[in-house]
Amino acid sequence: SGGFDFSFLPQPPQEKGDGKGVGLGPGPMGLMGPRGPPGASFQGPAGEPGEPGQTGPAGARGPAGPPGKAGEDGHPGKPGRPGERGVVGPQGARGFPGTPGLPGFKGIRGHNGLDGLKGQAGAPGVKTGARGLPGERGRVGAPGPAGARGSDGSVGPVGPAGPIGSAGPPGFPGAPGPKGELGPVGNPGPAGPAGPRGEQGLPGVSGPVGPPGKGAAGLPGVAGAPGLPGPRGIPGPVGAVGATGARGLVGEPGPAGSKGESGNKGEPGSAGPQGPPGPSGEEGKRGPSGESGSTGPTGPPGLRGGPGSRGLPGADGRAGVMGPAGSRGASGPAGVRGPSGDTGRPGEPGLMGRGLPGSPGNTGPAGKEGPVGLPGIDGRPGPVGPAGPRGEAGNIGFPGPKGPTGDPGKGEKGHAGLAGNRGAPGPDGNNGAQGPPGLQGVQGGKGEQGPAGPPGFQGLPGPSGTTGEAGKPGERGIHGEFGLPGPAGPRGERGPPGESGAAGPVGPIGSRGPSGPPGPDGNKGEPGVVGAPGTAGPGSGGLPGERGAAGIPGGKGEKGETGLRGEVGTTGRDGARGAPGAVGAPGPAGATGDRGEAGAAGPAGPAGPRGSPGERGEVGPAGPNGFAGPAGAAGQPGAKGERGTKGPKGENGIVGPTGPVGAAGPSGPNGAPGPAGGRGDGGPPGLTGFPGAAGRTGPPGPSGITGPPGPPGAAGKEGLRGPRGDQGPVGRTGETGAGGPPGFAGEKGPSGEPGTAGPPGTAGPQGLLGAPGILGLPGSRGERGLPGVAGAVGEPGPLGISGPPGARGPPGAVGPGVNGAPGEAGRSDGPPGRDGLPGHKGERGYAGNAGPVGAAGAPGPHGTVGPAGKHGNRGEPGPAGSVGPVGAVGPRGPSGPQGVRGDKGEAGDKGPRGLPGLKGHNGLQGLPGLAGQHGDQGSPGPVGPAGPRGPAGPSGPAGKDGRTGHPGAVGPAGVRGSQGSQGPSGPAGPPGPPGPPGASGGGYDFGYEGDFYRA
């Protein structure tokens, strides 16, 4: 027991046990001998270094010296070098949907695009035939190829602030955000409450004797010869039962178990959730032309529409298809060529005529984006398309945010192991003191991936993500069924004026009508002075006058010179609707006027009837992951998931300073051993004594039966951040989990900067003519547009060859001019008059006031089809016409051919930071991993802090009253818990509410052979 301290001698290496010996535990505890006197330390003169001798046998460990004084605080170390950049981790799991972000502000108006390219001249039209009956509404034809995008125009004036739009459908969940920077070290928190009683840990490995107190280090002396162990002391009296030791550290994992027997074949699992959409497949080759489909059944009669508002002036119609050939009549005698007649009146509107489709026009400038339309009814699922080729692996995503700390789980009671064979009794060991905590074990390997947990509850929709790159153009979807056309929407905003288009070819010369009787020569009047326009009086507009009786149509006067342009007068009130007048002879076609000012947008029309559900299109390519939104509100607790695999062992926290040890009390004299008394009541736990000498390690005892798990301990305080560990190896990409159901559609993010225009796409092949579609309901009439500015007079074309005389048309309607005073009645008994000489060309009069708009006349009876006239000479192209007003909205055409992918757009501005999310659910505790093999004994670690207080031991005899020790220092904060595992994806939420009705764009419709085109 006395003698020198041999703790500085090298210890023999500990042999690694195979873990197969089983005994009934260590032998009975030996009696503690009396404490020997402290060994005298001496320092010999420094000798010359000798040859390294062989390692002698290990001497007995001497008793522990008195504890040294607490060392002074050391100087803070130099800041470490910045760590190397870590390897990009695998793509994190999909984060919880964040809370919906606040609606963004309305963006400023974009630049007006440049005028579109000048269109090519159309092909010459076909000879006009008789107007056929209107055909049934055709299907939507394939759209023309997309035109090249114009460069950005100058910034337009800032328009008035529009009304706040209704909230759009919720956005897709954002992708996990990047890992935040390290925050500053927080102040140490207050001490937490005492945790519940912990489980009894495995006995720790005896640690080395603590370092001596702070003192000047002496010169190393010559290694002396190992001393002989002293004689064994006289056994002392039986000591009192000590308090239960502190909870030991968790032992190293045991060796891997042997492979178990094959289990029974399980029942077939239920069908997994729908997988995520596959990547966009490559554009397939053009398939062969399909067979002509049979005519579908006649659709149900449409609902009777209400009378619509007055429509906008329609665009110029295209040349109709030549009508059916009439029955051949008897050849008449050749007539004498008559003089050139006046231009005939326009023909009556044909009933259900079918025009040939014209050449595809150039794409106009892109209109403004309309509001979100009403969501359609879920379409019927279309046929499953062929599986596309496997896409390239995506980029590794950002690591997901760190999950919250999971609540401690309650493990189930394990099965009791088989009792091992009885081991040989070990030698009596000295009663060793509790050693310091052992070294950190080797990190366990990655466990196998556990089965997918049940789907969680639907999370809240995340905030709108930043605008991602434009996705690859999707494949063309299957044509949906034609729904009933909705009513025409409100008139869209006026687009920028396009360039003047090329003049179309001169149409065929119409049939000549009979020459009317020339009128009497009028007296040439002197042009009066142009009066200034009068201002509108304060009174209200007068009542509309009644329409006068139809006058006798006068002879066609010669074209007068262009008069001075009068100032625009105030708009008069609409006159009462007059009786339908007779159709007048058409005047010469005026030049197309310049485009008028855009009128104010009319009120939104009522929502149309819900269309029939379209067929479901093919699944588009998955977009890139957005950034992670803030955590959403806590959902309902999910079902208990299956137990996950055991995670890697966490790093040890920074060891806190050891508190001062209290002064030892005086030892009392040893009394004579008395007779063994009865077991006394349990006394209070004694103070922790000085650490005794470490005894020799006995043989390992048998494995005890695993006891029931104790109650979960309280959550520890968050400790200081540990030093950065070494960079670990790149983990293998885990298996792709089952795709969760699609989430809500996210809110519309801010529009990104416009990308550069891609090259113009090539025209797609001409599609097959479809079967005639269902006749749609008539749309509501749009509001009347503002009158356009009068156009310049065009150059007269060359005179065409006169055609044969046509049938005489009905008398024309009264012109807009003021009715002349009735002339004096002529004599009825006079001779018949002769044709007078042609009158002199009169000067052009001033523009008359605009009369009220007359109602459309009733369609007249069908005239007989006249013989076709000869083709006239091709006229000179007239002046460029201005763009007509936007027509009513036609139904949406099918998707066009896949265009060339555009360049990547510029990144949008960073959105505002989202609201902080609520704390998520805690993960479940994983199963303990298999015990690993014992590692080699590590080097002694530093003295750790005192372990937690163990449970109360059995009652011992009453101890003597000791002196009160000094109060201990505040212990360090605990190590932060490990990160919880990512929970499974939640199930698909309910569909979002329908959005507001969208504004309809412009366009005009024309049908052909049952196909419905939209311009």
From Swiss-Prot:
**Species annotation:** Doedicurus sp.
Note the InterPro entries from the entry: Collagen, Collagen_superfamily
- PTM annotation, UniProt: Prolines at the third position of the tripeptide repeating unit (G-X-Y) are hydroxylated in some or all of the chains.
Sorted keywords for this record are:
Extinct organism protein, Extracellular matrix, Glycoprotein, Hydroxylation, Secreted
Q: Per its database record, what is this protein's job? A: Type I collagen is a member of group I collagen (fibrillar forming collagen).
Extra facts: These protein fragments were extracted from an ancient scute bone collected at Camet Norte in Argentina.
Q: State the residue spans of region: Disordered.
A: 1-1015
Residue(s) carrying 5-hydroxylysine: 106
Q: What are its GO cellular component terms?
A: extracellular matrix; extracellular space
Q: Where is it located?
A: Secreted; Secreted, Extracellular space; Secreted, Extracellular space, Extracellular matrix
Specify residue ranges for compositional bias: Basic and acidic residues: 70-84, 640-649, 901-912
4-hydroxyproline, modified sites? 10, 13, 38, 346, 349
The biased composition feature labelled Low complexity covers 43-69, 140-169, 194-208, 235-250, 324-340, 497-514, 568-612, 619-639, 657-670, 687-697, 751-778, 786-799, 846-868, 877-897
Q: Where is the composition biased (Gly residues)?
A: 20-30, 302-311, 441-450, 534-545, 674-686, 734-743
Q: What is the lineage of its organism?
A: Eukaryota, Metazoa, Chordata, Craniata, Vertebrata
What protein am I looking at?
Collagen alpha-2(I) chain
Q: How does it assemble?
A: Trimers of one alpha 2(I) and two alpha 1(I) chains. Interacts (via C-terminus) with TMEM131 (via PapD-L domain); the interaction is direct and is involved in assembly and TRAPPIII ER-to-Golgi transport complex-dependent secretion of collagen.
- Which family does the record claim for this protein? Belongs to the fibrillar collagen family.
- The record lists glycosylation at 106
Expression by tissue: Expressed in bones.
